[in-house]
Amino acid sequence: MNKKVVKPRLAIISCVLLAAVALVSAQSKTSNATAGSQLETRCGWFSNPTPSNVSLHDRDGEWIIGVQGGHQAKGDWPTFGPKQWVETNVHYGYGCACLRLRVNRESHEVIEIQSSRARPLSVCGKDRRLKRWKFEWEK
């Protein structure tokens, strides 16, 4: 075989192999992160102050469910009755809820909501494990 033909072929094969290794490595990291993320139940203040900006504030801090123009978790939000929801901006506001979900513990982002249920406001109001914090519009 001609040496001029062999060198380019080796270079192409090397590049293809390196790209394949990088792709497999990236997929492995993604699947490990998802596989390690177990379903868990978290209860706290469900805040939706403006369109698509949603988070759950529980005893461990803030869990980002959605950011306008960015991250949005899969799954349905809780349905709140009139006595379970405090309107602060037209129909936007906050309530108390429990969510069965999958989270990314490093970024505090909610990946998926499997199920959710609204709770009476008094449940979160009386829960001493929830930090006393003020909503952005109350500061």
Each model region followed by its residue ranges:
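N-terminal secretory signal peptides
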Residues: 27-89
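N-terminal secretory signal peptides that target proteins for export/translocation
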Residues: 1-8
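Beta-strand-rich cores of mature extracytoplasmic or soluble domains
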Residues: 77-139
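Bacterial N-terminal signal peptides
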Residues: 11-22
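N-terminal soluble segments of membrane proteins
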Residues: 24-27, 138-139
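Generic detector of ordered secondary-structure context
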Residues: 9-11, 36
